[in-house]
């Protein structure tokens, strides 16, 4: 039996990583075989790319940024995601191609189509069975981050993060069969329950 592929999206600080951890614990208790991955990263090569992308001292042009994300993604798909799905595992991925659509395509202004062409090569055309979008405001994201040191993307302007959120909401509306909108402003365990209710439908 083939596995499942579930991705999580949202602006920085929306709680993806926490909710993935909660979901992993829940699914392991149900007896499922789980692989948790993150983007950029998840492989030896990808983690090196991640260091470049998130280093606050680096100036990276929008096109370079798009290509670096795509290179990390290509390695992840071939080395980890496809083999895990073939082995019947449930892959929980913290960000995938939709992040590039909104961050580089929409917020950076490169255009969705340009990003799509590059990423169809990088992903070999695979898409998640379901994408869980956790929605919070940029104001809430900043509050949650608190005094933790921000990485290169987190240090972007207020307007940039507003555009990222707008981009996600457009994607949710454009691809309603794949995306599920989760209100991330709710209490932590209510968000977790909503996510479990969604995931159960795909298992």
UniProtKB/Swiss-Prot annotation:
It comes from the Bacteria. It is an enzyme of class 2 (transferase). Keywords: ATP-binding, Kinase, Nucleotide biosynthesis, Nucleotide-binding, Transferase. Its EC number is 2.7.4.9. It catalyses: dTMP + ATP = dTDP + ADP. Gene3D superfamilies: P-loop containing nucleotide triphosphate hydrolases. GO terms for biological process: dTDP biosynthetic process; dTTP biosynthetic process; dUDP biosynthetic process. ATP binds at residues 10-17. Disulfide bonds: none annotated. PROSITE patterns: THYMIDYLATE_KINASE. GO terms for cellular component: cytosol. One of its GO terms (molecular function) is dTMP kinase activity. InterPro entries: P-loop_NTPase, Thymidylate_kin-like_dom, Thymidylate_kin_CS, Thymidylate_kinase. Belongs to the thymidylate kinase family. Phosphorylation of dTMP to form dTDP in both de novo and salvage pathways of dTTP synthesis. This is Thymidylate kinase. It comes from Thermoanaerobacter pseudethanolicus (strain ATCC 33223 / 39E) (Clostridium thermohydrosulfuricum).
């Amino acid at each position: 039996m083939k596995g499942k592929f579930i991705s999580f999206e949202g602006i920085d600080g929306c709680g993806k990583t926490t909710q993935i951890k909660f979901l992993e614990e829940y699914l392991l208790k149900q007896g499922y075989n789980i692989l948790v991955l993150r983007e950029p990263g998840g492989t030896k090569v990808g983690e090196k790319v991640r260091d470049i992308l998130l280093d606050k001292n680096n100036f990276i042009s929008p096109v370079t940024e798009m290509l670096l994300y795509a290179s990390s993604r290509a390695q992840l798909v071939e080395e980890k995601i496809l083999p895990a799905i073939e082995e019947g595992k449930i892959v929980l991925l913290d960000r995938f191609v939709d992040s590039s659509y909104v961050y580089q395509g929409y917020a950076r202004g490169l255009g969705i189509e340009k990003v799509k062409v590059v990423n169809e090569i990088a992903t070999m055309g695979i898409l998640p069975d379901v994408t869980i979008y956790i929605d919070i405001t940029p104001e809430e994201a900043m509050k949650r981050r608190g005094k933790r040191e921000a990485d290169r993307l987190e240090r972007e302007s207020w307007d940039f993060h507003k555009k990222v959120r707008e981009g996600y909401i457009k994607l949710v509306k454009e691809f309603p069969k794949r995306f599920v909108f989760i209100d991330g402003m709710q209490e932590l365990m209510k968000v977790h329950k909503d996510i479990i209710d969604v995931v159960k439908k795909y298992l």
